[in-house]
Amino acid sequence: MNEAGHVSEETYSERIARAEPQFGDILYSREGTYFGIAAEMPRNQRVCLGQRMVLIRPNPAKINSRFLRLWLNSPILSRHIHGFRDGTVAERLNMPTIRGLPVPIFQRDDQNAIAELLGAIDDKIELNRRMNETLEAMAQAIFRDWFVDFGPTRRKIDGAPDPFEIMGGLVADPDRARQMADLFPASMGDNGLPEGWHHDRLGNLVTNVIERCVPSEMTRDRPYVPIDTITARSLVIQETRPGSEAQSSLIAFRQNDILFGAMRPYFHKVALAHFEGTTRTTVFVLRPKIASDLGFALMTINDGTTIEYATQHSSGTTIPYAVWRNSLERMLVPCPPREVRVRFGHILEPMLNRMQASASQNRTLSATHDLLLPKLMSGEIRLRDVEARLEAAQ
């Protein structure tokens, strides 16, 4: 539900003519990118279905809706439905097949317990995801106010007397707000930047590092992060693959390198690596030339202006690729004095650490969820057997 589109009231009314989704319903994708994926209808939201979706309304007297959603998303049922696909270009399930999908028979108490157990993992994953969204929004707000809109300088020009006000209310600590406000000039220069700032090339801020490697014991022991595992518009790596899957066109990255999705750059895939690993040449590995510039460099590369520049100057028509040499590296970016960049990094660092910790926990929780789900659904293990594993994941 995180990437739902929006429709007009007229379209909404047309699409709910037969049935309006309500809390407890299951929304099931029978075709396309999300083939075979089920989602629960959330509380207090108005939702209508697209043409590739099916509304399933569980009988509450017979089945727990969350349990049914878990079953529909289980590897067991996934293997089952792939034998009934009737599409050649796009995967598709017809309605008779959906109506005939098998559902395991569990006592209602067992259904509720499984739903509560695995649902708690899902809820924690979602809480971490939302927390990271909030932290990233805060980081972007500070970056854009300071380095795109030049808010502190403009507020000084407008006569703002209070450091908290000068910093746009984005620095809560009074002492830190005063120290930061003192670093921003009270006038704009002829170059359109705060007095004393200058434009510099992106290539003078970061280096595009290409450390090629081949499948080996080293790559097998490190996480593998191909471009499709990098989440769009997320500053941290949320998903990795086993190093054994790293087979060709490989490049290594280090902790605190910045991964930039070069293939189809408009997808806006930028993430900070908090571990050593391997990716492919469809990703730029950008390393700050000065370690203390990490936060400023990360947010500069993540800014929409950089993504737009990379997209407009990409090569290829069917599959565009960003070009670093003599192109993206030459993009001009505002460059404040080093002390401003360092102070910004100090503010950003705890946010990034929190985001990385949440992402790491989510990977552990997801792995635990994926391990338990088929075993619980098949009866291979019982609920009492999983308590120790869940405690370790928490």
List where the protein language model places each region.
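Basic, amphipathic alpha-helical recognition segments used for DNA target recognition
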Residues: 1-3, 17, 23, 42-46, ...
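Sequence-specific dsDNA recognition surfaces
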Residues: 1-26, 183-188, 203-255, 279-280
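A generic structural signal for residues embedded in beta-strands
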Residues: 28-29, 259-261
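Non-catalytic accessory segments of hydrolases
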Residues: 32-33, 223, 265
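Short, Lys/Arg- and Gly-enriched loop/turn segments at beta-strand edges
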Residues: 34-41, 267-273
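Short aromatic/hydrophobic "clamp" motif used to bind/position activated sugar donors
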Residues: 51-53, 256, 281-283
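Extended, domain-scale alpha-helical bundle/helix-rich regions
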Residues: 127, 149, 153, 158-167
